[in-house]
């Protein structure tokens, strides 16, 4: 949910001629694996300054986020929710030759409320409330090939995430959620077509991609014994979207995403964003 994506975060930036802008984004959806179901709502807003360079448009800004996540495990497994708040900075460059580069760094504080169950050990850790800290660093690059009123845009993205450790206890037993590090990659391609709706311009687009864990290290210990060690995962992403430039200042976007072939998949997510430039 906290992962970055330029188009979903701020919509279509090409063609904007302004000095600054404010934007907001709402992402909601659900996902699942063999062992649990996952619902999420992510709200993000930001402000940026637009700089007109000799060969590019540069957007530099700040962002704040709030995320609500609910996890429902199978009977006798882990259940709970996470409420997160975060803040970050970003820089996006759109070059005249079609190339673009987006970078973001973000800090997130996570407040957890969970019931943990380890059936093989016959141990439960009930009503555990604790917080952790996460740091995200991401970069996305792509190139837009313009084809008349349409385009094809290959993309590549990598995100590093670091989570802090949590130490819990219940009924004389200790539960340690070790600090974790992860590196997630994404390769994909979007294709779109621009057309007019009255006085507005709209771009309908579709995308397909492959997301995978390049590196992943996380582990849960119960009384010093390893009880869980998540393995790497990968999935295919599929997207449909519509970006509308209502006028020179206002733009909105809507997209749908799902994934397949992963141990965990997004069943459906809906992303909407709005931007006002001035």
Language-model region placement:
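Short coil-to-helix leader/linker segments, especially the first N-terminal amphipathic alpha-helix
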Residues: 1-8
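Membrane translocator/pore-forming domains, dominated by Gram-negative outer-membrane beta-barrels
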Residues: 7, 16-21, 25-278
